[in-house]
Protein backbone atom coordinates (compact mmCIF):
# COMPACT_ATOMS: atom_id res chain seq x y z
CA UNK A 1 0.00 0.00 0.00
CA UNK A 2 1.54 3.36 -0.95
CA UNK A 3 1.88 6.21 1.51
CA UNK A 4 0.26 9.55 0.69
CA UNK A 5 1.52 13.11 1.03
CA UNK A 6 -1.16 15.81 1.07
CA UNK A 7 -0.14 19.27 2.25
CA UNK A 8 0.77 22.74 0.95
CA UNK A 9 -1.63 22.39 -1.97
CA UNK A 10 0.00 19.29 -3.44
CA UNK A 11 -0.36 15.56 -3.05
CA UNK A 12 1.37 12.45 -4.33
CA UNK A 13 1.79 8.76 -3.57
CA UNK A 14 5.12 7.22 -2.61
CA UNK A 15 6.39 3.86 -1.29
CA UNK A 16 5.49 3.38 2.36
CA UNK A 17 9.03 2.23 3.23
CA UNK A 18 10.56 5.51 1.99
CA UNK A 19 11.39 8.27 4.47
CA UNK A 20 9.80 11.72 3.98
CA UNK A 21 11.28 15.01 5.21
CA UNK A 22 9.81 18.46 4.71
CA UNK A 23 11.86 21.66 5.11
CA UNK A 24 11.48 25.36 4.48
CA UNK A 25 14.81 26.73 3.28
CA UNK A 26 16.19 30.27 3.67
CA UNK A 27 14.63 31.51 0.46
CA UNK A 28 11.21 30.48 1.77
CA UNK A 29 10.96 27.61 -0.69
CA UNK A 30 9.48 24.34 0.48
CA UNK A 31 11.52 21.17 -0.09
CA UNK A 32 9.94 17.73 0.23
CA UNK A 33 12.54 14.96 0.21
CA UNK A 34 11.86 11.22 -0.11
CA UNK A 35 14.67 8.74 0.46
CA UNK A 36 14.63 5.04 -0.33
CA UNK A 37 16.10 2.41 1.99
CA UNK A 38 18.94 1.96 -0.54
CA UNK A 39 19.94 5.65 -0.67
CA UNK A 40 18.20 6.77 -3.86
CA UNK A 41 16.07 9.87 -3.44
CA UNK A 42 13.38 12.03 -5.04
CA UNK A 43 12.62 15.60 -4.05
CA UNK A 44 10.50 18.50 -5.11
CA UNK A 45 11.23 22.15 -4.39
CA UNK A 46 8.28 24.52 -4.54
CA UNK A 47 8.92 28.21 -5.09
CA UNK A 48 5.84 30.33 -4.44
CA UNK A 49 7.17 33.06 -6.71
CA UNK A 50 6.89 32.58 -10.45
CA UNK A 51 10.38 32.32 -11.91
CA UNK A 52 11.47 30.89 -15.23
CA UNK A 53 11.50 27.14 -14.79
CA UNK A 54 14.48 26.89 -17.17
CA UNK A 55 16.46 29.19 -14.86
CA UNK A 56 15.59 27.06 -11.85
CA UNK A 57 16.79 23.94 -13.69
CA UNK A 58 20.05 25.70 -14.69
CA UNK A 59 20.66 26.85 -11.11
CA UNK A 60 20.15 23.30 -9.85
CA UNK A 61 22.52 21.94 -12.50
CA UNK A 62 25.19 24.51 -11.56
CA UNK A 63 24.90 23.53 -7.88
CA UNK A 64 25.56 19.90 -8.85
CA UNK A 65 28.49 20.87 -11.07
CA UNK A 66 30.15 22.68 -8.17
CA UNK A 67 29.71 19.66 -5.89
CA UNK A 68 31.02 16.91 -8.20
CA UNK A 69 34.12 16.85 -10.40
CA UNK A 70 32.98 15.35 -13.70
CA UNK A 71 29.36 15.97 -14.49
CA UNK A 72 27.94 14.99 -17.86
CA UNK A 73 24.54 16.44 -18.68
CA UNK A 74 22.08 16.73 -21.52
CA UNK A 75 18.89 18.78 -21.80
CA UNK A 76 15.56 16.94 -21.54
CA UNK A 77 11.95 17.86 -22.18
CA UNK A 78 9.01 15.74 -21.10
CA UNK A 79 5.28 16.10 -21.42
CA UNK A 80 3.32 14.47 -18.63
CA UNK A 81 -0.41 15.01 -18.88
CA UNK A 82 -0.92 18.69 -19.67
CA UNK A 83 2.44 19.77 -18.24
CA UNK A 84 5.63 20.43 -20.15
CA UNK A 85 8.69 19.85 -17.99
CA UNK A 86 12.23 20.79 -18.92
CA UNK A 87 15.59 20.21 -17.33
CA UNK A 88 18.63 17.96 -17.49
CA UNK A 89 19.67 14.36 -17.24
CA UNK A 90 22.94 14.16 -15.32
CA UNK A 91 25.60 11.47 -14.87
CA UNK A 92 28.50 11.70 -12.42
CA UNK A 93 30.75 9.58 -10.21
CA UNK A 94 30.24 9.51 -6.45
CA UNK A 95 31.88 6.99 -4.10
CA UNK A 96 33.19 5.04 -7.13
CA UNK A 97 29.66 4.57 -8.46
CA UNK A 98 28.04 6.08 -11.51
CA UNK A 99 25.05 8.14 -10.45
CA UNK A 100 22.20 9.27 -12.64
CA UNK A 101 20.02 12.22 -11.76
CA UNK A 102 17.19 14.08 -13.41
CA UNK A 103 16.14 17.70 -12.97
CA UNK A 104 12.66 18.62 -14.20
CA UNK A 105 11.08 22.02 -13.65
CA UNK A 106 7.70 23.52 -14.51
CA UNK A 107 5.28 26.27 -13.45
CA UNK A 108 1.70 25.89 -12.24
CA UNK A 109 -0.61 28.60 -10.87
CA UNK A 110 2.18 31.08 -10.16
CA UNK A 111 4.40 28.52 -8.42
CA UNK A 112 7.57 27.02 -9.84
CA UNK A 113 8.35 23.38 -9.13
CA UNK A 114 11.69 21.64 -9.47
CA UNK A 115 11.80 17.85 -9.24
CA UNK A 116 15.18 16.25 -8.66
CA UNK A 117 15.87 12.55 -8.35
CA UNK A 118 19.12 10.65 -8.01
CA UNK A 119 20.21 7.02 -7.88
CA UNK A 120 23.38 5.05 -8.34
CA UNK A 121 23.26 2.77 -11.35
CA UNK A 122 22.92 -0.38 -9.23
CA UNK A 123 19.43 0.73 -8.17
CA UNK A 124 18.44 2.76 -11.22
CA UNK A 125 16.34 0.11 -13.00
CA UNK A 126 14.08 -0.26 -9.97
CA UNK A 127 14.10 3.31 -8.68
CA UNK A 128 13.55 5.07 -11.99
CA UNK A 129 10.08 3.52 -12.30
CA UNK A 130 9.30 4.60 -8.73
CA UNK A 131 10.53 8.15 -9.40
CA UNK A 132 8.35 8.32 -12.51
CA UNK A 133 5.30 7.07 -10.57
CA UNK A 134 5.78 9.64 -7.79
CA UNK A 135 6.17 12.41 -10.36
CA UNK A 136 3.11 11.23 -12.28
CA UNK A 137 0.88 11.22 -9.18
CA UNK A 138 2.07 14.72 -8.26
CA UNK A 139 1.29 16.09 -11.73
CA UNK A 140 -1.96 14.17 -12.10
CA UNK A 141 -3.26 15.53 -8.82
CA UNK A 142 -2.21 19.11 -9.64
CA UNK A 143 -4.61 18.87 -12.58
CA UNK A 144 -7.63 18.32 -10.37
Regions found by a protein language model. Give the residues of each.
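Hydrophobic residues embedded in beta-strands of well-ordered beta-sheets
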Residues: 30, 112-113
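Structural motif
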Residues: 9, 111-112
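Surface-exposed amphipathic alpha-helical segments
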Residues: 18, 114-144
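Residue-level marker for the onset of beta-strands and adjacent loop->beta junctions
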Residues: 1, 8, 28-31, 74, ...
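Signature of long, low-cysteine stretches enriched in small and polar/charged residues
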Residues: 60-110, 132
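Secretory pathway targeting signatures of secreted, lumenal, and periplasmic proteins
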Residues: 2-62
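Loop/helix-junction capping segments adjacent to catalytic residues or to phosphate/diphosphate-binding pockets
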Residues: 54, 96, 124-125
Amino acid sequence: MPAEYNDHGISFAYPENWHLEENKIESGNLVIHLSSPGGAFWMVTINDRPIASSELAKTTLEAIRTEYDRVDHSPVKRVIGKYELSGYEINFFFLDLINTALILSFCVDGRTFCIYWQSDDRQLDICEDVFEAITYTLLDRLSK
